[in-house]
């Protein structure tokens, strides 16, 4: 009886949402129920996929273009609007679909056009990443809906959109924190899964500076994942989210909680040498001294051992999982993520690691740890240098470890290194301070140098990005005249990559090493239904 009453309550709740399809400016959707969406289809035919594709585009376009979602006026909840539309749009024919969507846009309220406000965004220094030409397709959308969408492009919008704005005044990074992540939604039904897909797809469409760099055309991703998100069921939702995010091939684009999680780990320092996962030294080394072959890693593993499998799973198989479920910009990132996951992929008390030493193969059991805050999962090579993070390798060559560097020590560092012929800046670990302007610009630039091009969103015209060409340095006759060498590898990411780009812009700057992880630029966080969060690179970064 208790079970029956629970089911009855849920049924009435779902019916209430489905029935609440009224329109008009007066509706208030701030108290959206979250038990179920009112749409729980599990199969979609070709027409339904087409309908949902159009719905996603029109809903997202209106969300970011209609004045009803700007400023502090009105209380429309854009998620509730979508959930109301889903059941009727999914099963409509094309004519009915277009009529209903046009009626919905009318219901959001009247708007005026102000094309003159956007004229400057069509000139030099702006890039238009979103493909908005689909709004003019009258054969697909019908004349009324198409006309409304085309007019919305240059609607008179005031203030910021309620679902995206700059992170802080003067910031270029978007803030999506007003999006509802529905953290108490433990088993998202079809409607909420499609809400996640539609929200994410439109964020990328209008606010992702690297949209044009995805391996698969972003337009092609939508219909494919409409089927996936509809048919996967609540139990497959997490995996589909992970695979969707992987379509970006952006090493910043992590999903939390990860689809490949674990609570326990072993601390083995390893990295790919070619296609082989090799154990490498894990403790600080003197840069002058060759590394002996018998340095222990985590006993009984030693420097030079090749890891063949972990818990019965080959390294190639783990790498395949990473490609499928973890967003990686390049093969270097695939190798890095594989290395991390190989040793954080179980909740068991121990790992079984198969390894090769010389011509012999053996297996070892290593106890796991759960004190994740004790230290990093994987140690990166580092050298014992001074407290200032610098040292003289010899009279001609200086060395700076970016991971131990501080701008406060800049003057003292240059006093030590100023008479050298070259300075190596080691960027193989994440910089501990932002050295671009206060250090590199101050001591290494003879004049103002445009070292990078950034692109960041124009919030009043979604899909448009403004170019920014910042400069480092000023007229400085006493600048350092030696060579400046950025040392990079597969651990170099984000701010470290930006630092390397800046070094290359210096008069005698160059980069030495191997391919970096490929995730430059600031990040933005996107909440998704079910309490999930994901990141994107939110700033386009280009060589000048």
Name the predicted role of every residue range.
Residues 33, 44-51, 62-77, 87-89, ...:
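Cleft-lining beta-strand/loop regions that shape enzyme active-site pockets
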Residues 22-28:
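Bacterial lipoprotein signal-peptidase II cleavage site
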Residues 50-60, 77-84, 96-103, 107, ...:
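Extracytoplasmic/secreted proteins, especially bacterial periplasmic and envelope-associated proteins
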């Amino acid at each position: 009886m208790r079970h029956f009453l629970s089911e009855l309550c849920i049924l009435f709740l779902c019916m209430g949402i489905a029935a609440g399809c009224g329109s008009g400016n007066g509706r208030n959707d701030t108290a959206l129920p979250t038990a179920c969406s009112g749409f729980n289809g599990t199969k979609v035919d070709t027409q339904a996929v087409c309908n949902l594709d159009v719905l996603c585009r029109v809903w997202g376009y209106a969300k970011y273009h209609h004045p009803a979602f700007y400023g502090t006026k009105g209380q429309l909840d854009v998620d509730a609007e979508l959930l109301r539309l889903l059941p009727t749009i999914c099963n409509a024919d094309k004519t009915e679909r277009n009529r209903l969507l046009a009626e919905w846009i009318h219901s959001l309220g009247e708007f005026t056009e102000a094309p003159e406000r956007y004229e400057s965004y069509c000139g030099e220094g702006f890039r238009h990443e979103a493909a908005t030409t689909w709004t003019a397709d009258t054969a697909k959308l019908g004349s009324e809906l198409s006309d409304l969408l085309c007019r919305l492009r240059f609607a008179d919008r005031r203030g910021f959109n309620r679902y995206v704005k700059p992170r802080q005044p003067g910031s270029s990074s978007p803030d999506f924190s007003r999006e509802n992540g529905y953290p108490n939604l433990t088993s998202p039904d079809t409607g909420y899964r499609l809400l996640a897909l539609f929200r994410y797809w439109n964020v990328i469409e209008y606010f992702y500076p690297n949209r044009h760099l995805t391996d698969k055309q972003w337009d092609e991703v939508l219909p494919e994942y409409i089927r996936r998100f509809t048919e996967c069921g609540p139990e497959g939702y997490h995996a589909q989210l992970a695979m969707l995010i992987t379509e970006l091939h952006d090493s910043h684009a992590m999903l939390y909680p990860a689809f490949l999680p674990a609570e326990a780990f072993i601390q083995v320092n390893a990295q790919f040498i070619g296609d082989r996962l090799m154990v490498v030294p894990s403790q600080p080394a003197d840069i002058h001294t060759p590394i002996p072959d018998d340095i222990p890693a985590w006993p009984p593993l030693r420097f030079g051992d090749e890891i063949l499998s972990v818990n019965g799973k080959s390294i190639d198989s783990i790498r395949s999982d990473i490609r499928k479920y973890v967003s990686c910009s390049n093969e270097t990132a695939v190798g890095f993520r594989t290395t991390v996951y190989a040793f954080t992929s179980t909740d068991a008390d121990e790992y079984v690691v198969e390894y090769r030493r010389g011509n012999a193969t053996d297996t070892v059991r290593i106890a796991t740890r759960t004190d994740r805050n004790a230290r990093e999962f994987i140690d990166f090579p580092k050298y014992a240098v001074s407290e200032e993070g610098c040292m003289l390798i010899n009279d001609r060559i200086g060395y700076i470890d970016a991971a131990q560097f501080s701008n406060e020590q800049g003057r003292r560092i240059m006093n030590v290194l100023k008479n050298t012929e070259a300075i190596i800046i080691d960027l193989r670990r994440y910089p501990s301070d932002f050295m671009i302007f206060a250090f590199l610009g101050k001591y290494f630039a003879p004049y103002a140098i445009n070292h990078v091009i950034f692109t960041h969103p124009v919030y009043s015209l979604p899909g448009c990005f403004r170019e920014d060409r910042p400069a480092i340095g000023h007229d400085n006759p006493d600048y350092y005249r030696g060579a400046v060498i950025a040392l990079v590898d597969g651990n170099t990411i984000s701010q470290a990559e930006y630092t390397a780009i800046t070094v290359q812009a210096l008069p005698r700057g160059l980069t030495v090493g191997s391919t970096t992880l490929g995730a430059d630029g600031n990040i933005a966080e996107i909440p998704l239904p079910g309490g999930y969060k994901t990141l994107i690179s939110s700033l386009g970064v280009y060589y000048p």
